Amino acid sequence: MVRNSSDEEEDHRNLIPQNDTRDNDLNLRPDARTVNMANGGGRSPRSALQIDEILSRARNRWKISVNKRYVVAAVSLTLFVGLLFLFTDTRTFFSSFKLDPMSSRVKESELQALNLLRQQQLALVSLLNRTNFNSSNAISSSVVIDNVKAALLKQISVNKEIEEVLLSPHRTGNYSITASGSDSFTGSYNADICRKVDQKLLDRKTIEWKPRPDKFLFAICLSGQMSNHLICLEKHMFFAALLDRVLVIPSSKFDYQYDKVIDIERINTCLGRTVVISFDQFKEIDKKNNAHIDRFICYVSSPQPCYVDEDHIKKLKGLGVSIGGKLEAPWSEDIKKPTKRTSQEVVEKFKSDDGVIAIGDVFYADMEQDLVMQPGGPINHKCKTLIEPSRLILVTAQRFIQTFLGKNFISLHLRRHGFLKFCNAKSPSCFYPIPQAADCISRMVERANAPVIYLSTDAAESETGLLQSLVVVDGKVVPLVKRPPQNSAEKWDSLLYRHGIEDDSQVYAMLDKTICAMSSVFIGASGSTFTEDILRLRKDWGTSSMCDEYLCRGEEPNFIAENE
Protein backbone atom coordinates (compact mmCIF):
# COMPACT_ATOMS: atom_id res chain seq x y z
CA MET A 1 0.00 0.00 0.00
CA VAL A 2 1.40 3.18 -0.99
CA ARG A 3 1.63 5.82 1.76
CA ASN A 4 2.17 9.42 1.14
CA SER A 5 5.06 11.38 2.55
CA SER A 6 3.02 13.10 5.19
CA ASP A 7 2.02 9.79 6.79
CA GLU A 8 5.63 8.62 6.90
CA GLU A 9 6.70 11.76 8.65
CA GLU A 10 4.00 11.40 11.26
CA ASP A 11 5.01 7.77 11.92
CA HIS A 12 8.59 8.85 12.24
CA ARG A 13 7.68 11.37 14.91
CA ASN A 14 5.71 8.81 16.88
CA LEU A 15 8.66 6.38 16.94
CA ILE A 16 10.83 8.75 19.11
CA PRO A 17 11.54 7.00 22.46
CA GLN A 18 10.19 8.53 25.70
CA ASN A 19 13.58 8.42 27.35
CA ASP A 20 15.25 10.36 24.56
CA THR A 21 17.69 12.75 26.18
CA ARG A 22 18.07 15.15 23.36
CA ASP A 23 17.00 18.66 23.87
CA ASN A 24 13.92 20.36 22.58
CA ASP A 25 13.63 22.52 19.47
CA LEU A 26 16.60 24.48 20.57
CA ASN A 27 18.73 21.48 19.64
CA LEU A 28 16.98 20.76 16.27
CA ARG A 29 18.60 21.79 13.06
CA PRO A 30 17.18 24.94 11.54
CA ASP A 31 15.89 23.12 8.45
CA ALA A 32 14.03 20.55 10.53
CA ARG A 33 12.36 23.28 12.52
CA THR A 34 11.33 24.96 9.29
CA VAL A 35 9.70 21.81 7.93
CA ASN A 36 7.91 21.22 11.19
CA MET A 37 6.52 24.71 11.17
CA ALA A 38 5.42 24.38 7.57
CA ASN A 39 3.37 21.27 8.29
CA GLY A 40 1.11 22.87 10.77
CA GLY A 41 3.59 22.74 13.26
CA GLY A 42 2.63 22.72 16.97
CA ARG A 43 3.59 19.90 19.27
CA SER A 44 1.10 17.45 20.63
CA PRO A 45 0.35 17.45 24.43
CA ARG A 46 2.49 14.38 24.85
CA SER A 47 5.54 15.90 23.25
CA ALA A 48 5.21 19.04 25.47
CA LEU A 49 5.19 16.94 28.65
CA GLN A 50 8.25 15.11 27.49
CA ILE A 51 10.12 18.34 26.94
CA ASP A 52 9.20 19.63 30.46
CA GLU A 53 10.45 16.40 31.94
CA ILE A 54 13.70 16.75 30.09
CA LEU A 55 14.14 20.33 31.33
CA SER A 56 13.46 19.27 34.93
CA ARG A 57 16.07 16.56 34.74
CA ALA A 58 18.61 19.00 33.35
CA ARG A 59 18.01 21.41 36.21
CA ASN A 60 18.50 18.68 38.82
CA ARG A 61 21.75 17.67 37.23
CA TRP A 62 22.94 21.31 37.28
CA LYS A 63 22.16 21.61 41.03
CA ILE A 64 24.13 18.47 41.79
CA SER A 65 27.05 19.81 39.75
CA VAL A 66 27.01 23.17 41.61
CA ASN A 67 26.93 21.47 45.03
CA LYS A 68 29.95 19.40 44.09
CA ARG A 69 31.80 22.56 43.11
CA TYR A 70 31.08 24.17 46.53
CA VAL A 71 32.39 21.11 48.33
CA VAL A 72 35.56 21.06 46.26
CA ALA A 73 36.10 24.80 46.84
CA ALA A 74 35.60 24.48 50.61
CA VAL A 75 38.03 21.56 50.85
CA SER A 76 40.60 23.44 48.77
CA LEU A 77 40.29 26.57 50.91
CA THR A 78 40.72 24.54 54.10
CA LEU A 79 43.85 22.89 52.74
CA PHE A 80 45.24 26.29 51.66
CA VAL A 81 44.68 27.87 55.09
CA GLY A 82 46.27 24.88 56.79
CA LEU A 83 49.34 25.05 54.60
CA LEU A 84 49.52 28.82 55.16
CA PHE A 85 49.64 28.40 58.95
CA LEU A 86 52.19 25.59 58.69
CA PHE A 87 54.68 27.21 56.37
CA THR A 88 54.40 30.99 57.03
CA ASP A 89 54.94 33.46 59.93
CA THR A 90 51.33 34.44 60.40
CA ARG A 91 52.12 37.37 62.68
CA THR A 92 54.30 38.96 60.02
CA PHE A 93 51.86 38.02 57.31
CA PHE A 94 48.84 39.66 58.89
CA SER A 95 50.76 42.66 60.18
CA SER A 96 51.43 43.59 56.58
CA PHE A 97 47.71 44.23 56.17
CA LYS A 98 47.60 46.87 58.95
CA LEU A 99 46.87 50.45 58.02
CA ASP A 100 49.97 52.64 57.72
CA PRO A 101 49.91 55.13 60.66
CA MET A 102 52.35 57.48 58.93
CA SER A 103 49.67 59.95 57.89
CA SER A 104 48.26 60.29 61.41
CA ARG A 105 51.76 60.66 62.90
CA VAL A 106 52.65 63.36 60.39
CA LYS A 107 49.45 65.24 61.15
CA GLU A 108 50.11 65.08 64.91
CA SER A 109 53.70 66.28 64.45
CA GLU A 110 52.58 69.17 62.29
CA LEU A 111 50.12 70.29 64.97
CA GLN A 112 52.86 70.13 67.62
CA ALA A 113 55.19 72.10 65.39
CA LEU A 114 52.55 74.77 64.84
CA ASN A 115 52.08 75.09 68.59
CA LEU A 116 55.83 75.47 69.11
CA LEU A 117 56.01 78.09 66.38
CA ARG A 118 53.26 80.01 68.14
CA GLN A 119 55.23 79.87 71.40
CA GLN A 120 58.33 81.03 69.58
CA GLN A 121 56.43 83.97 68.12
CA LEU A 122 55.16 85.04 71.54
CA ALA A 123 58.66 84.75 73.02
CA LEU A 124 60.17 86.92 70.28
CA VAL A 125 57.45 89.54 70.79
CA SER A 126 58.22 89.51 74.51
CA LEU A 127 61.91 89.97 73.73
CA LEU A 128 61.09 92.92 71.50
CA ASN A 129 59.01 94.51 74.26
CA ARG A 130 61.80 94.05 76.81
CA THR A 131 64.29 95.90 74.60
CA ASN A 132 61.93 98.87 74.17
CA PHE A 133 62.78 100.78 77.35
CA ASN A 134 62.89 104.48 78.07
CA SER A 135 65.22 106.63 80.08
CA SER A 136 62.96 106.63 83.15
CA ASN A 137 63.58 102.90 83.55
CA ALA A 138 67.02 102.68 82.03
CA ILE A 139 68.51 99.22 81.88
CA SER A 140 72.23 99.00 81.40
CA SER A 141 73.32 97.93 77.94
CA SER A 142 75.10 94.86 79.28
CA VAL A 143 71.87 93.61 80.88
CA VAL A 144 69.99 94.10 77.61
CA ILE A 145 72.67 92.26 75.65
CA ASP A 146 72.72 89.37 78.12
CA ASN A 147 68.93 89.06 78.03
CA VAL A 148 68.84 89.21 74.23
CA LYS A 149 71.53 86.55 73.95
CA ALA A 150 69.71 84.29 76.39
CA ALA A 151 66.38 84.78 74.62
CA LEU A 152 67.88 84.10 71.19
CA LEU A 153 69.57 80.99 72.51
CA LYS A 154 66.23 79.84 73.86
CA GLN A 155 64.57 80.36 70.48
CA ILE A 156 67.33 78.40 68.76
CA SER A 157 66.51 75.56 71.13
CA VAL A 158 62.79 75.89 70.31
CA ASN A 159 63.63 75.81 66.61
CA LYS A 160 65.60 72.63 67.20
CA GLU A 161 62.63 71.12 69.02
CA ILE A 162 60.32 71.98 66.10
CA GLU A 163 62.75 70.29 63.72
CA GLU A 164 62.79 67.16 65.88
CA VAL A 165 58.99 67.04 66.02
CA LEU A 166 58.65 67.31 62.25
CA LEU A 167 61.27 64.62 61.67
CA SER A 168 59.96 62.17 64.26
CA PRO A 169 57.35 60.45 61.99
CA HIS A 170 60.08 59.68 59.45
CA ARG A 171 62.23 57.76 61.91
CA THR A 172 61.31 54.09 61.50
CA GLY A 173 63.26 51.00 62.51
CA ASN A 174 66.99 51.44 62.15
CA TYR A 175 66.58 54.26 59.68
CA SER A 176 66.86 57.78 60.99
CA ILE A 177 66.88 61.20 59.42
CA THR A 178 69.38 63.40 61.22
CA ALA A 179 68.55 66.98 62.08
CA SER A 180 70.98 69.86 61.93
CA GLY A 181 73.74 70.19 64.50
CA SER A 182 72.20 73.13 66.34
CA ASP A 183 72.04 71.17 69.59
CA SER A 184 75.82 71.05 69.85
CA PHE A 185 75.95 74.76 69.03
CA THR A 186 73.38 75.68 71.69
CA GLY A 187 75.11 73.47 74.24
CA SER A 188 78.49 75.08 73.71
CA TYR A 189 77.01 78.57 73.54
CA ASN A 190 75.01 77.98 76.71
CA ALA A 191 78.15 76.88 78.50
CA ASP A 192 79.94 79.94 77.14
CA ILE A 193 77.33 82.49 78.22
CA CYS A 194 77.60 81.43 81.89
CA ARG A 195 81.25 80.40 81.82
CA LYS A 196 83.56 80.78 84.80
CA VAL A 197 85.26 84.14 85.25
CA ASP A 198 88.94 84.24 84.35
CA GLN A 199 90.73 84.93 87.65
CA LYS A 200 93.87 86.28 85.95
CA LEU A 201 96.04 85.01 88.78
CA LEU A 202 99.21 85.87 86.87
CA ASP A 203 98.32 89.58 87.14
CA ARG A 204 97.74 89.40 90.90
CA LYS A 205 99.58 91.98 93.02
CA THR A 206 100.15 91.17 96.67
CA ILE A 207 102.06 92.23 99.75
CA GLU A 208 103.95 90.05 102.23
CA TRP A 209 102.74 89.51 105.78
CA LYS A 210 105.80 88.99 107.93
CA PRO A 211 104.91 90.26 111.40
CA ARG A 212 107.29 91.02 114.23
CA PRO A 213 106.52 88.45 116.95
CA ASP A 214 106.22 91.06 119.71
CA LYS A 215 103.92 93.48 117.88
CA PHE A 216 100.15 92.91 117.89
CA LEU A 217 97.01 94.40 116.33
CA PHE A 218 93.92 93.80 118.48
CA ALA A 219 90.94 93.21 116.16
CA ILE A 220 87.65 94.92 117.05
CA CYS A 221 84.57 94.31 114.86
CA LEU A 222 81.19 95.54 116.11
CA SER A 223 78.92 96.57 113.23
CA GLY A 224 76.23 94.27 111.87
CA GLN A 225 76.00 90.49 111.85
CA MET A 226 78.55 87.75 111.22
CA SER A 227 79.06 88.66 107.55
CA ASN A 228 80.02 92.21 108.50
CA HIS A 229 82.40 90.91 111.13
CA LEU A 230 84.12 88.54 108.68
CA ILE A 231 84.62 91.39 106.21
CA CYS A 232 85.98 93.52 109.05
CA LEU A 233 88.32 90.69 110.08
CA GLU A 234 89.65 90.34 106.54
CA LYS A 235 90.40 94.07 106.40
CA HIS A 236 92.16 93.80 109.77
CA MET A 237 94.47 91.21 108.20
CA PHE A 238 95.40 93.71 105.48
CA PHE A 239 96.18 96.37 108.10
CA ALA A 240 98.21 93.88 110.16
CA ALA A 241 100.25 92.94 107.09
CA LEU A 242 100.92 96.62 106.29
CA LEU A 243 101.94 97.33 109.89
CA ASP A 244 103.98 94.11 110.35
CA ARG A 245 101.89 92.93 113.30
CA VAL A 246 100.34 89.67 114.52
CA LEU A 247 96.53 89.84 114.48
CA VAL A 248 94.68 88.99 117.71
CA ILE A 249 91.27 87.36 117.12
CA PRO A 250 88.63 88.72 119.56
CA SER A 251 87.25 86.63 122.40
CA SER A 252 83.87 84.91 121.93
CA LYS A 253 82.74 86.78 125.06
CA PHE A 254 83.25 90.04 123.21
CA ASP A 255 82.48 88.96 119.63
CA TYR A 256 81.33 85.88 117.70
CA GLN A 257 82.99 82.52 118.27
CA TYR A 258 84.93 82.55 115.03
CA ASP A 259 86.52 79.13 115.44
CA LYS A 260 83.08 77.51 114.96
CA VAL A 261 82.78 78.78 111.42
CA ILE A 262 86.36 79.36 110.20
CA ASP A 263 89.65 77.56 110.83
CA ILE A 264 91.92 80.10 112.49
CA GLU A 265 95.02 77.89 112.51
CA ARG A 266 94.62 77.26 108.77
CA ILE A 267 95.42 80.94 108.15
CA ASN A 268 98.87 80.42 109.67
CA THR A 269 99.34 77.29 107.54
CA CYS A 270 98.51 79.25 104.38
CA LEU A 271 101.25 81.77 105.12
CA GLY A 272 103.75 79.33 106.59
CA ARG A 273 104.19 81.38 109.78
CA THR A 274 102.22 82.61 112.79
CA VAL A 275 100.25 85.66 111.71
CA VAL A 276 97.04 85.25 113.78
CA ILE A 277 96.49 84.11 117.36
CA SER A 278 93.42 83.61 119.53
CA PHE A 279 92.54 85.88 122.44
CA ASP A 280 93.52 83.15 124.92
CA GLN A 281 96.93 82.77 123.25
CA PHE A 282 97.37 86.53 123.41
CA LYS A 283 96.63 86.59 127.15
CA GLU A 284 99.17 83.82 127.66
CA ILE A 285 101.86 85.71 125.73
CA ASP A 286 101.12 89.08 127.34
CA LYS A 287 100.98 87.88 130.94
CA LYS A 288 103.37 90.56 132.10
CA ASN A 289 101.19 93.38 130.80
CA ASN A 290 97.93 91.60 131.69
CA ALA A 291 96.55 91.85 128.13
CA HIS A 292 97.02 95.56 127.81
CA ILE A 293 96.12 97.65 124.70
CA ASP A 294 98.80 100.31 124.64
CA ARG A 295 97.14 102.65 122.16
CA PHE A 296 93.92 103.18 120.19
CA ILE A 297 94.62 104.72 116.77
CA CYS A 298 91.10 104.98 115.38
CA TYR A 299 90.51 104.55 111.65
CA VAL A 300 86.99 106.01 112.04
CA SER A 301 86.40 109.36 113.69
CA SER A 302 82.62 109.70 113.27
CA PRO A 303 80.00 109.03 114.57
CA GLN A 304 82.40 108.09 117.39
CA PRO A 305 86.14 107.32 117.47
CA CYS A 306 86.95 103.73 116.48
CA TYR A 307 83.17 103.13 116.16
CA VAL A 308 83.36 101.79 119.73
CA ASP A 309 80.88 102.90 122.38
CA GLU A 310 81.25 102.89 126.16
CA ASP A 311 79.43 99.56 126.55
CA HIS A 312 82.03 97.78 124.45
CA ILE A 313 84.86 99.45 126.35
CA LYS A 314 83.36 98.04 129.55
CA LYS A 315 83.13 94.58 127.94
CA LEU A 316 86.81 94.72 127.04
CA LYS A 317 87.76 95.68 130.56
CA GLY A 318 85.54 92.89 131.83
CA LEU A 319 87.70 90.44 129.89
CA GLY A 320 90.76 91.70 131.75
CA VAL A 321 91.94 93.95 128.94
CA SER A 322 93.30 97.28 130.11
CA ILE A 323 93.34 100.30 127.82
CA GLY A 324 96.01 102.97 127.77
CA GLY A 325 95.25 106.51 126.65
CA LYS A 326 92.26 107.87 124.79
CA LEU A 327 90.53 106.78 121.61
CA GLU A 328 91.91 109.19 118.99
CA ALA A 329 91.74 109.34 115.18
CA PRO A 330 94.63 110.67 113.02
CA TRP A 331 92.18 111.95 110.38
CA SER A 332 88.55 112.77 109.75
CA GLU A 333 86.69 109.68 108.59
CA ASP A 334 82.90 109.32 108.61
CA ILE A 335 81.35 105.87 108.07
CA LYS A 336 78.56 107.48 106.02
CA LYS A 337 81.04 109.02 103.59
CA PRO A 338 84.16 106.81 103.48
CA THR A 339 87.28 108.31 101.93
CA LYS A 340 89.45 106.24 99.61
CA ARG A 341 92.79 105.61 101.31
CA THR A 342 96.11 104.23 100.08
CA SER A 343 98.46 101.77 101.75
CA GLN A 344 101.06 104.50 102.12
CA GLU A 345 98.60 106.74 104.00
CA VAL A 346 97.75 103.91 106.40
CA VAL A 347 101.39 103.13 107.13
CA GLU A 348 102.16 106.81 107.76
CA LYS A 349 99.24 107.33 110.17
CA PHE A 350 99.20 104.00 112.03
CA LYS A 351 102.88 103.02 112.28
CA SER A 352 103.84 102.76 115.96
CA ASP A 353 106.42 101.23 118.26
CA ASP A 354 103.76 100.31 120.82
CA GLY A 355 103.48 96.60 121.48
CA VAL A 356 99.68 96.32 121.20
CA ILE A 357 97.50 98.71 119.24
CA ALA A 358 93.84 98.76 118.15
CA ILE A 359 92.31 100.69 115.26
CA GLY A 360 88.64 99.94 115.97
CA ASP A 361 86.00 98.72 113.53
CA VAL A 362 87.22 98.96 109.92
CA PHE A 363 84.20 97.44 108.18
CA TYR A 364 83.54 100.74 106.41
CA ALA A 365 87.18 101.33 105.43
CA ASP A 366 87.67 102.00 101.71
CA MET A 367 91.29 101.24 100.98
CA GLU A 368 93.11 99.82 97.93
CA GLN A 369 90.01 98.19 96.46
CA ASP A 370 91.91 97.00 93.40
CA LEU A 371 94.13 94.90 95.71
CA VAL A 372 91.40 93.84 98.15
CA MET A 373 89.07 92.62 95.39
CA GLN A 374 91.66 90.37 93.76
CA PRO A 375 91.05 86.60 93.93
CA GLY A 376 92.66 85.52 97.18
CA GLY A 377 92.89 89.07 98.51
CA PRO A 378 95.84 91.46 98.80
CA ILE A 379 98.14 89.21 100.88
CA ASN A 380 100.54 86.68 99.39
CA HIS A 381 99.73 83.11 100.54
CA LYS A 382 99.56 79.57 99.17
CA CYS A 383 95.81 78.93 99.63
CA LYS A 384 92.84 80.03 97.56
CA THR A 385 91.59 82.30 100.33
CA LEU A 386 92.51 83.05 103.93
CA ILE A 387 89.02 83.22 105.42
CA GLU A 388 86.87 80.29 104.38
CA PRO A 389 84.39 77.91 106.07
CA SER A 390 85.75 75.28 108.43
CA ARG A 391 86.35 71.77 107.14
CA LEU A 392 83.22 70.45 108.89
CA ILE A 393 80.99 73.03 107.21
CA LEU A 394 82.68 72.57 103.84
CA VAL A 395 82.13 68.79 103.77
CA THR A 396 78.57 69.18 105.08
CA ALA A 397 77.80 71.57 102.22
CA GLN A 398 79.21 69.09 99.71
CA ARG A 399 77.03 66.33 101.17
CA PHE A 400 73.95 68.55 100.94
CA ILE A 401 74.67 69.33 97.29
CA GLN A 402 75.18 65.64 96.50
CA THR A 403 71.90 64.78 98.25
CA PHE A 404 69.56 67.50 96.98
CA LEU A 405 71.05 69.58 94.15
CA GLY A 406 73.67 67.96 91.97
CA LYS A 407 76.42 69.72 90.07
CA ASN A 408 74.38 72.19 88.02
CA PHE A 409 72.24 74.47 90.17
CA ILE A 410 71.53 78.15 90.70
CA SER A 411 71.79 79.62 94.19
CA LEU A 412 69.62 82.53 95.24
CA HIS A 413 70.04 84.72 98.30
CA LEU A 414 66.68 86.39 98.83
CA ARG A 415 66.90 88.92 101.65
CA ARG A 416 63.45 90.06 102.84
CA HIS A 417 63.32 90.48 106.62
CA GLY A 418 63.89 94.15 107.47
CA PHE A 419 64.97 94.78 103.88
CA LEU A 420 61.92 96.73 102.69
CA LYS A 421 62.69 99.87 104.67
CA PHE A 422 66.44 99.56 104.08
CA CYS A 423 66.02 99.28 100.29
CA ASN A 424 63.41 102.00 99.96
CA ALA A 425 65.83 104.42 101.62
CA LYS A 426 68.16 103.84 98.66
CA SER A 427 67.75 105.13 95.13
CA PRO A 428 66.84 103.07 93.27
CA SER A 429 65.15 100.69 95.70
CA CYS A 430 66.37 97.07 95.82
CA PHE A 431 63.17 95.49 97.23
CA TYR A 432 61.21 93.80 94.43
CA PRO A 433 57.64 92.48 94.42
CA ILE A 434 57.61 88.68 94.34
CA PRO A 435 56.10 88.43 90.79
CA GLN A 436 58.79 90.75 89.40
CA ALA A 437 61.50 88.83 91.24
CA ALA A 438 60.10 85.56 89.87
CA ASP A 439 60.30 86.92 86.32
CA CYS A 440 63.96 87.92 86.81
CA ILE A 441 64.79 84.51 88.28
CA SER A 442 63.03 82.67 85.44
CA ARG A 443 65.10 84.57 82.87
CA MET A 444 68.27 83.56 84.70
CA VAL A 445 67.17 79.92 84.73
CA GLU A 446 66.76 80.10 80.94
CA ARG A 447 70.24 81.59 80.56
CA ALA A 448 71.96 79.15 82.90
CA ASN A 449 69.92 76.11 81.83
CA ALA A 450 69.87 74.82 85.42
CA PRO A 451 67.17 72.40 86.66
CA VAL A 452 66.99 73.51 90.29
CA ILE A 453 67.51 76.55 92.54
CA TYR A 454 68.93 76.59 96.06
CA LEU A 455 67.11 79.24 98.08
CA SER A 456 68.85 80.91 101.01
CA THR A 457 66.35 83.30 102.54
CA ASP A 458 64.82 84.79 105.65
CA ALA A 459 61.50 85.33 103.85
CA ALA A 460 58.21 84.09 105.25
CA GLU A 461 56.55 80.97 103.85
CA SER A 462 53.84 83.13 102.27
CA GLU A 463 56.47 84.83 100.09
CA THR A 464 58.52 81.75 99.23
CA GLY A 465 55.36 79.79 98.40
CA LEU A 466 54.23 82.47 95.97
CA LEU A 467 57.71 82.69 94.49
CA GLN A 468 57.80 78.92 93.95
CA SER A 469 54.52 78.99 92.03
CA LEU A 470 55.72 81.81 89.75
CA VAL A 471 59.20 80.59 88.77
CA VAL A 472 58.15 78.77 85.60
CA VAL A 473 60.22 77.98 82.51
CA ASP A 474 58.78 76.22 79.44
CA GLY A 475 55.58 75.55 81.33
CA LYS A 476 57.40 73.73 84.13
CA VAL A 477 57.82 74.95 87.70
CA VAL A 478 61.51 75.16 88.66
CA PRO A 479 62.03 73.66 92.16
CA LEU A 480 63.22 75.99 94.92
CA VAL A 481 65.17 73.91 97.44
CA LYS A 482 65.61 75.21 100.97
CA ARG A 483 67.71 73.67 103.70
CA PRO A 484 65.27 71.35 105.50
CA PRO A 485 64.67 71.33 109.27
CA GLN A 486 66.89 69.07 111.33
CA ASN A 487 66.02 65.41 110.89
CA SER A 488 67.94 62.59 112.52
CA ALA A 489 66.98 60.28 109.63
CA GLU A 490 68.98 62.43 107.21
CA LYS A 491 72.73 61.91 107.24
CA TRP A 492 74.00 64.81 105.16
CA ASP A 493 74.47 66.95 108.32
CA SER A 494 75.76 64.16 110.59
CA LEU A 495 79.15 65.88 111.00
CA LEU A 496 77.48 68.83 112.70
CA TYR A 497 75.68 66.51 115.14
CA ARG A 498 78.85 64.58 115.84
CA HIS A 499 80.71 67.75 116.84
CA GLY A 500 77.84 69.33 118.76
CA ILE A 501 77.34 72.40 116.55
CA GLU A 502 74.01 71.46 114.98
CA ASP A 503 72.09 74.10 116.96
CA ASP A 504 74.37 77.06 116.18
CA SER A 505 72.67 79.62 113.92
CA GLN A 506 76.03 81.01 112.75
CA VAL A 507 77.12 77.55 111.64
CA TYR A 508 74.01 77.22 109.47
CA ALA A 509 74.47 80.73 108.11
CA MET A 510 78.00 79.79 107.03
CA LEU A 511 76.64 76.52 105.61
CA ASP A 512 74.22 78.50 103.44
CA LYS A 513 77.07 80.70 102.22
CA THR A 514 79.16 77.66 101.36
CA ILE A 515 76.38 76.01 99.33
CA CYS A 516 75.76 79.27 97.46
CA ALA A 517 79.48 79.69 96.80
CA MET A 518 79.58 76.26 95.11
CA SER A 519 76.68 76.85 92.71
CA SER A 520 76.97 77.19 88.93
CA VAL A 521 75.36 80.64 89.02
CA PHE A 522 74.62 82.93 91.96
CA ILE A 523 71.85 85.54 92.28
CA GLY A 524 72.44 87.86 95.23
CA ALA A 525 70.66 90.61 97.12
CA SER A 526 72.00 94.09 96.41
CA GLY A 527 73.13 95.83 99.60
CA SER A 528 73.46 92.63 101.64
CA THR A 529 76.82 91.80 103.24
CA PHE A 530 75.72 88.15 103.30
CA THR A 531 75.67 88.31 99.50
CA GLU A 532 79.00 90.16 99.41
CA ASP A 533 80.69 87.45 101.48
CA ILE A 534 79.34 84.80 99.10
CA LEU A 535 80.70 86.76 96.14
CA ARG A 536 84.08 86.96 97.91
CA LEU A 537 84.17 83.19 98.37
CA ARG A 538 83.15 82.58 94.75
CA LYS A 539 85.85 84.97 93.56
CA ASP A 540 88.52 83.33 95.69
CA TRP A 541 87.45 79.74 94.97
CA GLY A 542 87.19 80.35 91.23
CA THR A 543 83.47 79.52 91.06
CA SER A 544 82.35 82.98 89.90
CA SER A 545 80.22 82.85 86.76
CA MET A 546 79.70 85.39 84.00
CA CYS A 547 76.00 85.15 84.89
CA ASP A 548 76.42 86.01 88.58
CA GLU A 549 74.40 89.11 89.40
CA TYR A 550 72.15 90.86 91.88
CA LEU A 551 68.45 90.06 91.69
CA CYS A 552 66.77 92.03 88.87
CA ARG A 553 70.02 93.84 88.10
CA GLY A 554 69.41 97.07 86.20
CA GLU A 555 65.68 97.14 86.96
CA GLU A 556 63.68 99.24 89.38
CA PRO A 557 60.81 97.75 91.40
CA ASN A 558 57.58 98.14 89.42
CA PHE A 559 55.89 99.38 92.60
CA ILE A 560 57.40 101.29 95.55
CA ALA A 561 55.58 102.15 98.77
CA GLU A 562 55.60 105.66 100.16
CA ASN A 563 57.65 106.60 103.22
CA GLU A 564 56.07 106.60 106.64
Swiss-Prot record:
Q: Which Gene3D superfamilies match?
A: 3.40.50.11350
Which superkingdom does the taxonomy of this entry point to?
Answer: Eukaryota
Disulfide cysteine pairs (residue numbers): none
Localization in the cell: Membrane
Q: Where is this region: Disordered?
A: 1-28
The residues that cross the membrane are 70-90
Q: How does it sit in the membrane?
A: Single-pass type II membrane protein
Put simply, this protein is called O-fucosyltransferase 5
Annotated InterPro entries? OFUT2-like
| Signal sequence segment | none
Q: Which UniProt keywords apply?
A: Carbohydrate metabolism, Fucose metabolism, Glycoprotein, Glycosyltransferase, Membrane, Signal-anchor, Transferase, Transmembrane, Transmembrane helix
Please list the residues annotated as glycosylated. Answer: N129, N134, N174
Q: Which family does it belong to?
A: Belongs to the glycosyltransferase GT106 family.
Molecular function, one GO term? peptide-O-fucosyltransferase activity
List cellular component terms (GO).
membrane
Main location (coarse class): membrane
Where substrate binds, per the record, is at H413, L414, R415, T529, F530
UniProt-listed Enzyme Commission number(s): 2.4.1.-
Q: Which PANTHER family match?
A: GDP-FUCOSE PROTEIN O-FUCOSYLTRANSFERASE 2
**GO BP terms, alphabetized:** fucose metabolic process
Recorded source organism is Arabidopsis thaliana
Pathway assigned in UniProt: Glycan metabolism
